[in-house]
Design a protein with these regions (language model features):
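N-terminal export and membrane-targeting signals
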Residues: 1-13
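Non-catalytic macromolecular-recognition regions in eukaryotic signaling proteins
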Residues: 21-195
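Hydrophobic core
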Residues: 12-20
Length: 195
């Protein structure tokens, strides 16, 4: 591998490497965010029982946000400035763990935006770098579980994090890739979302 050139523009350093192509590196030292990630049934997480989508009996539902065919479990716990300020940081981003549960047999696109294009990213599955867009294909409810007897359930669980540069209001758009359905919400991370 031989480095054959560099260019710099708007805080982004471009390394041109023979045999590899182009690698983008942020001048702060971290890789630039990818434009989108894809998660499928194989990248799911599992619990000791089938995952139930929009379970009204589940403990912790007070911290859950439902947006169309998607549940964000634990996201409301980060609206407090005190809780948000205690989050750990990685590569200059606060790390907020939020479980995604997608209704069975759905194909959805999830997009987030904040104060700046890279101020909020999603890192789910085995992603090394965050992205502002996820494409998610959930399992059928009758998909066999890998870690226990039985089936996946009416929701497919994905674990990961929101990466945020600062406390902010995050805009989220969820769209069903098979139908014209689109849902929008604003998520408070360490501050209130004003109308």
């Amino acid at each position: 591998m031989k480095r054959i050139g560099t260019a710099s523009s708007a805080g982004l350093l471009v390394l041109i490497v023979s045999g590899i192509g182009i690698v983008f590196v942020d001048q702060r030292g971290s890789a630039s965010p990818t434009s989108q990630q894809h998660l499928g049934c194989a990248q799911r997480a599992e619990t000791s029982a089938p995952t139930v989508f929009h379970d009204s009996e589940r403990r912790g539902r007070a911290t859950t946000v439902l947006i169309g065919p998607l549940e964000l479990r634990g996201v409301r716990s980060y609206r407090s400035p005190r809780v948000f300020s205690q989050l750990g940081k990685r590569r200059g981003y606060y790390i907020a763990k939020v479980a995604l549960v997608v209704q069975a047999r759905r194909s959805v696109r999830l997009r987030v935006s904040g104060k700046r294009p890279d101020s909020v990213l999603l890192a789910y599955g085995s992603a090394e770098a965050g992205s502002n867009e996820l494409l998610i294909d959930s399992c059928a409810a009758t998909t066999r579980a890998r870690t226990r007897p039985g089936f996946v359930g009416s929701g497919t669980l994905f674990t990961g994090v929101f990466e945020l540069t600062a406390a902010q209001c995050v805009n989220m758009v969820v769209s069903d890739r098979a139908t014209p359905g689109t849902w929008r919400t604003r998520l408070p991370f360490g501050r209130k979302c004003l109308s």
